[in-house]
A protein has these predicted regions:
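Single conserved hydrophobic/aromatic residue that forms the stacking wall/gate
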Residues: 1-11
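Short, conserved glycine- and acidic-residue-centered signature motifs
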Residues: 3, 20, 184, 188
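Short glycine/threonine-rich catalytic loop with a Thr-x-Gly-x-Asp
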Residues: 16-23
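Amphipathic alpha-helical segments in well-structured domains
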Residues: 23-24, 70
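Hydrophobic helix-and-loop "lid/oligomerization" segment in the mid-to-C-terminal part
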Residues: 36-190
């Protein structure tokens, strides 16, 4: 059987009621299960902010458990005890402001994702793990810088692609597939 078919079979056969849980939601559920019932509320309160950021960043369906995680995480985000998340909120100009899924999707998530796209995923991981406020501030600034770099690279790719299209005759534009060896692999899919 193909891997895709095997996955479909597993999903259909699974007794779990919500089939569209984000990967970060699965990780949260694992933490809760390993922590035990007596620690479930405390663990959820601690990690729901990270799970909300991941759920929103992955553009998951906002229904069922994804919605609960996102709602609770957004509510808890301004009071997070994750030093790195706090530093990123500050560096992004969101500290003390109401946080919605829009701020996550268009402000925080792009900064976190820029690290991986630009070949420095360790910076995002370090930011989320650090307990040192000075280090968190340094990492948050680095992520914001990488995001600006990612935006510039993305704009250059778009300009190059537009130029390639404009050089084509109108009758050759019905279906387009563009590429360039010069386009950054981490950004080209955006």
């Amino acid at each position: 059987l193909s891997i895709r078919r095997q996955r479909q079979m597993c999903i259909r056969d699974s007794p779990y009621p919500f089939k569209h849980l984000a990967g970060v939601g699965v990780a949260l559920k694992l933490v809760l299960a390993l922590g035990g019932e007596s620690r479930e509320d405390a663990l959820f309160a601690r990690y729901c902010t990270l799970a909300a950021i991941g759920t929103i960043a992955d553009v998951m369906r906002m229904e069922g458990e994804n919605r609960t995680i996102a709602f609770c995480g957004l509510e808890a985000l301004p009071h997070t005890d994750f030093v790195g998340v706090h530093a990123l909120l500050k560096e992004a100009g969101l500290l003390g402001k109401p946080i919605t899924s829009v701020q996550i999707g268009f402000v925080l998530a792009p900064r976190i994702n820029a690290a991986g796209r630009m070949g420095a995923a360790d910076l995002a991981a370090d930011l989320l793990e650090t307990d040192d406020p000075a280090r968190a501030e340094e990492l948050a600034k680095a992520l914001c810088d990488l995001n600006r770099e990612r935006q510039a690279v993305e704009q250059a790719i778009c300009a190059d692609a537009t130029e390639k299209i404009e050089r084509l005759r109108a009758e050759d534009r019905s279906a387009l597939v563009l590429s360039s060896e010069d386009w950054h692999q981490g950004v080209v899919g955006i």
